[in-house]
């Protein structure tokens, strides 16, 4: 339309007019679910909890001549339309997040109305809504009556064709290079604006009676192939990353990478692989092989659910470690209680095989060792030793497959509490484990080792660098004992109902006794270090399992999922490394964390290239 001049006396937006009616609360409709899936596919780098995507027009950010309907996606004009002072606009609910990289929306012209004085574009928060987009500073629009583009000015520039009833106009914002182009009926019209600021809102404006438009923020497939355009820019950004110049420092760069890989292998216990890598690259290994294998063995025990044995082994190889880390010790004991409920800890699997020593002070007891009891000089370290979890249950509920743990072979001979001949228990090579232990001192450099052929794990099969040998009998996080009862008393609606400890009364009593001792340990730690809410929550969550006849199907049953052993395993492994003055996290993981944080900072700073340089794209 003809160029318009700014009118300082123009009216202000009306707040709270919801003539279109907002969608009601409750469960997401199928349409909303499909929208969420499409937006996630288009903009995977966007954290919608921090920076929500536009999904509709805002009933609180529009001029009073604008009416909304159909879920705030349809806009109609309800003013007089006498002149430019009657123009009215509406902004979307949220600005375009920089992490989109490329953002696109479409507007269908349902009716051009009397004159077709319509504008489609972008505007910043606070721009006057009594104007068409493009007429004011930080406002940009493409107008249908004359095909002109308006860039923060009342004077338009020739840009594209006019548009009318039935046309679909798209607006694409490139947050990487700060440009914007429009499409008409699926065809690009070329660059309209450059040097765009951040935090712009999709905006439409109408001026004459009868004008109606519908927005598509992803509710329906777009006419324009925006995903092809995104692929083009993703290739450009990734090409920039790949071509980053390092030739002048190539030798230094390679040495850094080799050290990062070596330390990662050592951290997670890939002993043989780390040794072979060090031999090929001449990279020194900071930790002795014996210590690596000791950590590997401890991790293996934790991931199998044999936490009592893991505690005893840790105390043997690294005396004083757990007693100086009461939070870690308490977390391990709580996890042991959970595994006793699960039926995987040797305390309930091998009741009849405990030696006199273990009966007197068995490895599974929650009591602190008399030799290493905590003193007032010990620090109560909550952050370094315990991840944010309850009983080793990560705060983010994992949905990973429960069947990732291969079946164990036979009973353990490395611990007096696991020497049962139960067919479902796990062991190590006696010649490489038990015998060597008898003749070696209890230290972090003990030569108790298991042969590489038994203890080394293949990285592609065992994430986290530890052998995952949970029994294939694990179903939904529950250990199915040989004596699991499935008679009439354990049937529920014709389906087998799992019972605590397979219905074994002695094992159930052992769990209850262990729980009392665990409660006593909690009270002891409370007296020495003060009350810890995290400890209280761990204890409550663990004890809650006993309130249900089928703990695996109860509301807190996710604790029994084998995947929940991993944060406990990681915390213990990090504490061992830290006690040896080694990094508790491998430098490779720190570098990945730094890269991820840099990308988040780029998004907050409005640098759109962060969307196409995601760390996950480089992890294979």
Curated annotation (Swiss-Prot):
Domain LisH, first and last residues per copy: 253-285
Signal peptide: none
Alphabetical list of InterPro entries matching this protein: B30.2/SPRY, B30.2/SPRY_sf, ConA-like_dom_sf, CRA_dom, CTLH/CRA, CTLH_C, LisH, SPRY_dom
Residues annotated with N-acetylalanine modification: 2
CC per GO annotation: cytoplasm; cytosol; nucleus
Keyword terms, alphabetized: Acetylation, Cytoplasm, Nucleus, Phosphoprotein
Annotated GO biological process: cytoskeleton organization
Domain B30.2/SPRY positions: 35-222
Biased composition (Low complexity): 409-436
Region (Disordered): 1-34, 347-459
PANTHER family associated with the record: RAN BINDING PROTEIN 9-RELATED (PTHR12864)
Domain notes: The SPRY domain mediates the interaction with MET.
Subunit structure: May form homodimers. Identified in the CTLH complex that contains GID4, RANBP9 and/or RANBP10, MKLN1, MAEA, RMND5A (or alternatively its paralog RMND5B), GID8, ARMC8, WDR26 and YPEL5. Within this complex, MAEA, RMND5A (or alternatively its paralog RMND5B), GID8, WDR26, and RANBP9 and/or RANBP10 form the catalytic core, while GID4, MKLN1, ARMC8 and YPEL5 have ancillary roles. Interacts with RAN and RANBP9. Interacts with the HGF receptor MET. Interacts with AR. Interacts with TUBB1. Interacts with YPEL5. May interact with TUBB5. Interacts with DDX4.
Protein name (record): Ran-binding protein 10
Species this protein is from: Bos taurus
UniProt lineage: Eukaryota, Metazoa, Chordata, Craniata, Vertebrata
Primary gene name: RANBP10
């Amino acid at each position: 339309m003809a160029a318009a001049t700014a009118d300082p006396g123009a009216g202000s937006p009306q707040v709270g007019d919801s003539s279109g009616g907002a969608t009601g609360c409750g469960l997401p409709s199928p349409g909303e679910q499909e929208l969420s899936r499409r937006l996630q596919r288009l903009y995977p780098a966007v954290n919608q909890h921090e920076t929500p995507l536009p999904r509709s027009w805002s009933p609180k950010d529009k001029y009073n001549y604008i009416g909304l309907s159909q879920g705030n996606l349809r806009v109609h004009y309800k003013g007089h339309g006498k002149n430019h002072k009657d123009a009215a606009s509406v902004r979307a609910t949220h600005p375009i997040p920089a992490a989109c990289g490329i953002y696109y929306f479409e507007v269908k012209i349902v009716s051009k109305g009397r004159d077709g004085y319509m504008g489609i574009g972008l505007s910043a928060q606070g721009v006057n809504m009594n104007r068409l987009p493009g007429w004011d500073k930080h406002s940009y629009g493409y107008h249908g009556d004359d095909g002109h583009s308006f860039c923060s000015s009342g004077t338009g520039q020739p840009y594209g064709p006019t548009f009318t009833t039935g046309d679909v106009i798209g607006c694409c914002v490139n947050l990487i290079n700060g440009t914007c182009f429009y499409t008409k009926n699926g065809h690009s019209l070329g660059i309209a604006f450059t040097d765009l600021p951040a935090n712009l809102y999709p905006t439409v404006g109408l001026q004459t009676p009868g004008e109606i438009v519908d927005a598509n923020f992803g509710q329906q497939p777009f006419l324009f192939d925006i995903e092809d355009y995104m692929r083009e820019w993703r290739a450009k950004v990734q090409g920039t990353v790949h071509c980053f110049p390092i030739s002048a420092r190539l030798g230094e760069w390679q040495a850094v990478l080799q050290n990062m890989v070596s330390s990662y292998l050592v951290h997670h216990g890939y002993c043989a692989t780390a040794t072979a890598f060090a031999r090929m690259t001449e990279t020194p290994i900071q930790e002795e092989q014996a210590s690596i294998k000791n950590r590997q063995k401890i991790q293996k025990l934790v991931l199998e659910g044999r936490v009592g044995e893991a505690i005893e082994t840790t105390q043997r190889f690294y005396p004083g470690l757990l007693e100086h880390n009461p939070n870690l010790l308490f977390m391990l004991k709580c996890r042991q209680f959970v595994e006793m409920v699960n039926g995987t800890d040797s305390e309930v699997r091998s009741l009849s095989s405990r030696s006199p020593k273990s009966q007197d002070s068995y490895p599974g007891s929650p009591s602190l060792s008399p030799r290493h009891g905590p003193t007032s000089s010990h620090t109560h370290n909550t952050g370094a030793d315990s991840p944010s979890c309850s009983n080793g249950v990560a705060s983010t509920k994992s949905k990973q497959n429960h069947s990732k743990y291969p079946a164990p072979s036979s009973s353990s001979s490395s611990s007096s509490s696991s020497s049962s001949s139960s067919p479902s228990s796990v062991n190590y090579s006696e010649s490489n484990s038990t015998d060597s232990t008898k003749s070696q001192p209890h230290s972090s450099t003990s030569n108790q080792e298991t042969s590489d052929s038994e203890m080394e794990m293949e990285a592609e099969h065992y994430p986290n660098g530890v052998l995952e040998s949970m029994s294939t009998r694990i179903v939904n996080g529950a250990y199915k004992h040989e004596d699991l009862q499935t008679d009439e008393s354990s049937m529920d609606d014709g389906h087998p109902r799992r019972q605590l400890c397979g219905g074994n009364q002695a094992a159930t009593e052992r769990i209850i006794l262990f729980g009392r001792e665990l409660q006593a340990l909690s009270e002891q730690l409370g007296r020495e270090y003060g009350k810890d809410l995290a400890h209280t929550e761990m204890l409550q969550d663990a004890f809650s399992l006993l309130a249900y006849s089928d703990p695996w199907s109860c509301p807190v049953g996710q604790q029994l999922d084998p995947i929940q052993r991993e944060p406990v395993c990681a915390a213990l492994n990090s504490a061992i490394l830290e006690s040896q003055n080694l990094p508790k996290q491998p430098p490779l993981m720190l570098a990945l964390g730094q890269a991820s944080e840099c990308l988040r900072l780029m998004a907050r700073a409005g640098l759109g290239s962060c969307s196409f340089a995601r760390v996950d794209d480089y992890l294979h």
